[in-house]
Regions:
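Structured, mid-chain assembly/scaffold modules that mediate subunit interfaces
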Residues: 9-17, 69-82, 99-104
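A glycine- and small-residue-enriched flexible loop/hinge signal that marks low-structured segments
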Residues: 84-287, 329
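Extended beta-strand solenoid/passenger and fiber regions
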Residues: 1-57, 64-70
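Generic recognition of long tandem-repeat/solenoid scaffolds
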Residues: 3, 8-11, 42-52, 243-260, ...
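Compositionally biased, low-complexity/repeat regions
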Residues: 64-72, 76-82, 321-375
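Acidic, low-complexity glycine/serine/threonine-rich segments
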Residues: 270-331
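Short, ordered beta-strand-loop transition motifs
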Residues: 1-4, 34-46, 144-145, 176-178, ...
Length: 375
């Protein structure tokens, strides 16, 4: 590799920096002492020769190492497993997020892979009871390759073929194109979703649907552009699948989770409501975990009820929920449960759903003519 102005550019993608072997003539250079290596915006490796190092007078470098091969990855690798030795891989590593980082997964995605039925099934399964207690959602792609749905009216059949049915799943059809670069719909939809959360105080009560996104086209996996009008996009939505719609700029279009239309329960079908339920449950667990193993007395019960209802009143006053109230009901806490150290609280929660249809009724009033012309 030729050195120009102290920098050698290795024009290869997927190179592992910690496996690089860099030589100047016959001398092997040491990372951090003789050179530094980093990726540029193209994914190439920039090797900077350090003045005073062993390669200071070199005009070229000999570079070898390990390069990843994305084509060798299989759906089974993405789903993962637990080996006989207890080593976790793929989606099995989701379990490790909270104990390692103390962060609860919010959205699971596998761009470029979730259009595979095995992967999408794995993602849906992993959204519930993470670490035994937490819940989240996933965003998956409906296959738009030649083997999938290439027309909007094929989406229903392809969704069923992929077995995408979970209330914790948001399905997206079509890739997004920015310039000449294609992005999986699931990746772009996830970005729109978290951006919407950030614009609303990190509370996931607002639907990402109808939020503009800076893309230049919606397309099939092979890059073929697809122009959907609102009527066609609504048909896709009726299958429980979101897509991209261009009305004064591209926007994500669709409020329903993948359980729709088979399940029309508002807490399950609306993506924003479903996410709010997951988020609120996870927040409750994290907030009051410190109370676990405290004396199960009246003071503990009142503290939890009062604290949660103060929070709930804030949600109601800000128009986030129509109702948010926590109660301790004696009927749900028999003596046998209390003796076993189990306390149950009952929460009444109604986050506002999206205004998916706004209709106008227009009436012609003939009497207004005579009134207007009366002398």
């Amino acid at each position: 590799v030729q050195i120009n102005s102290g920098v050698a550019v290795l024009e290869e993608e997927g190179v592992l920096l910690d496996k690089l072997v860099v030589k100047a003539a016959s001398a092997t250079l040491t990372a951090g002492t003789d050179y530094t290596a980093a990726f540029d915006d193209n994914g190439y490796v920039n090797i900077v020769v350090i003045p005073g190092g062993a390669g200071k007078s070199a005009t070229s470098l000999t570079v070898s190492g390990v390069q990843i091969d994305p084509s060798a990855v299989t759906p089974a690798d993405i789903v993962g497993a637990v080996s006989a030795a207890g080593v976790e891989s793929g989606m099995e590593c989701i379990r490790m997020i909270f104990p390692k980082l103390n962060m609860v997964p919010g959205i699971l995605i596998a761009p470029g892979w979730s259009e595979n039925a095995i992967v999408s099934a794995g993602l849906q399964a992993k959204t519930t009871r993470i670490n035994g207690v937490f819940n989240c959602v996933c965003i998956v792609d409906i296959d738009s390759s030649t083997n999938g749905a290439t027309k909007y009216d094929d989406v229903k059949q392809q969704k069923e073929k992929q077995a995408v049915t979970s209330a914790n799943c948001y399905a997206v059809w079509l890739y997004a194109k920015v310039g000449d670069v294609l992005y999986a719909g699931s990746a772009m939809a996830a970005a729109v979703t978290v951006a919407t959360d950030a614009d609303n105080g990190d509370i996931p009560n607002v639907s990402p649907s109808n939020k503009t996104v800076p893309i230049s086209a919606a397309c099939l996996k092979d890059g073929t552009e697809v122009l959907l009008d609102q009527e066609q996009a609504n048909v896709v939505n009726s299958f429980g699948v979101a897509t991209w719609l261009n009305i004064n700029g591209f926007r994500l279009w669709g409020n329903n989770t993948a359980c729709y239309p088979g399940n029309t329960d508002p807490k399950d079908r609306w993506f924003s409501v479903r996410r709010f339920f997951c988020w609120d449950d996870n927040t409750f667990i994290q907030t009051y975990f410190q109370k676990v193993d405290s004396p199960a007395n009246k003071r503990l019960i009142e503290a939890l009820v009062d604290s949660e209802n103060v929070r709930g009143n804030s949600f109601v006053s800000r128009g986030i929920c129509a109702r948010y109230e926590l109660k301790y009901l004696e009927s749900e806490n028999p003596t046998t449960n209390l003796l076993n150290g189990c306390i149950t609280f009952h929460k009444y929660m109604t986050p506002f759903g999206p205004a998916e249809d706004i209709e106008e009724l227009v009436e012609f009033d003939p009497d207004a003519l005579s009134t207007a012309l009366a002398q």
